[in-house]
Design a protein with these regions (language model features):
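Accessory, non-ATPase domains that flank or precede helicase/AAA+ motor cores in DNA-metabolism machines
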Residues: 1-208
Length: 208
């Protein structure tokens, strides 16, 4: 790397390298707290292949900046191994005479017993409205948006990775969150331009 230190993610350890030539040594371990799962890294690889870009162009959106102080107080819970289930895709038109956020709560309530639920909204305002609507129904949600304070965002990201039956509500980058036992994904206002990443490669929540 031209004599410079660069950051990387340890994906796996093997007894013998798969490539020939000189290998660089790991000079420093920044954290023992996992920041991704095999499934989330596979998703990142798939998206980068689909958009013909470097995986790091996707990782900068997918994984929030590390906050060391959060990791010091973080206690990882036991992850639930997801079993294979039939994937279904459903388009639902919301009723015009009922608040959209209340209708999303109904969908969450319908699916939360099967596992964790992820709701992606186009902007911060919609995220807050959905979280408020969930709170009225005594449902707690983890918020994941780029506008959050770094500490709060990173803490919620790690909590989503290790909590059971969690409800996560966020903006577009939350689509990559390695949520424990994720079973349901709801994309609110899927035609909104805010679901497009503004930086290259310009992925869309719906496509991911």
């Amino acid at each position: 790397f031209g004599g410079r230190e660069t950051e990387g993610i340890v994906v796996e350890r093997v007894s013998a390298p798969a490539r020939a030539g000189e290998l660089k040594s790991i000079t420093k371990l920044l954290s023992v707290v996992p920041i991704a799962t095999t499934q989330s890294l596979t998703l990142i690889d798939s998206v980068s292949a689909h958009y013909a870009c470097n995986p790091w162009d996707v990782i900068r959106s997918a994984i929030p900046p590390r906050v060391a102080s959060v990791e010091k107080n973080f206690v990882a819970g036991k992850q639930v191994l997801s079993t294979k289930s039939k994937n279904t895709v459903e388009f639902q038109t919301l009723a015009p005479y009922i608040e959209a956020h209340e209708q999303i709560v109904s969908v969450v309530l319908k699916n939360r017993d099967t596992g964790s639920v992820l709701v992606i909204a186009p902007d911060e305002k919609d995220v807050d409205r959905i979280i408020q609507a969930l709170a009225k129904n005594n449902l707690q949600a983890l918020k994941l948006t780029a506008a959050m304070p770094r500490e709060d965002r990173y803490r919620n990201y790690l909590d989503a990775m290790h909590s059971a039956n969690s409800i996560v509500v966020g903006t577009r980058s939350a689509i990559f969150a390695p949520i424990n036992d994720l079973r349901t994904i709801i994309v609110h206002k899927e035609s909104s331009f805010d679901h497009y990443e503004v930086r290259s490669p310009g992925w869309n929540t719906r496509t991911v």
